[in-house]
């Protein structure tokens, strides 16, 4: 089960690994008061997953960042569809974006592949289940999207 505690722990670890001193390039080149509005846009068709983790990546980086989800967890989306809108201090948005994208891409990919398997066994007695064979430290988020 993906709890808020699990999400916070995973996101904080990812931020500490990716940007332990902040995002130095942004801090050196972007004014502190600059704001940014951007969107998480799908490159291909899929199933949305990881919205809570995306939100946490931005909000834990800077509480002034707002994330508006445009796709609900577990819903199908099409290429080019906006899945979320992110707005806030540019430095914070840019610091968190790689972490948020990494989680979103991986979680959406797992949810999309799982949906394909579920569709493939529809009408049979087969069931699709998850496994414990996952990425160390990221088991909960990987299993939550199956």
Residues of each region from the PLM?
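Acidic/glycine-rich phosphate/pyrophosphate-binding loops and surrounding catalytic core
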Residues: 2-146
């Amino acid at each position: 089960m993906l709890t808020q505690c699990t999400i916070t722990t995973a996101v904080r670890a990812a931020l500490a690994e990716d940007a332990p001193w902040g995002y130095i390039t942004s801090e050196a080149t972007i004014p502190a008061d600059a704001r940014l509005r951007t969107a998480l846009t799908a490159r291909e068709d899929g199933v949305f997953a990881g919205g809570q983790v995306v939100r946490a990546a931005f909000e834990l980086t800077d509480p002034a960042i707002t994330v508006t989800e445009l796709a609900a967890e577990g819903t199908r989306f099409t290429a080019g569809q906006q899945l979320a809108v992110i707005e806030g201090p540019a430095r914070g948005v840019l610091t968190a974006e790689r972490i948020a994208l990494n989680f979103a891409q991986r979680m959406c990919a797992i949810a999309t592949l799982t949906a394909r398997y579920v569709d493939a066994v529809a009408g049979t007695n087969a069931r699709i289940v998850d496994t414990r064979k996952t990425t160390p430290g990221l088991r909960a988020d990987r299993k939550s999207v199956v």
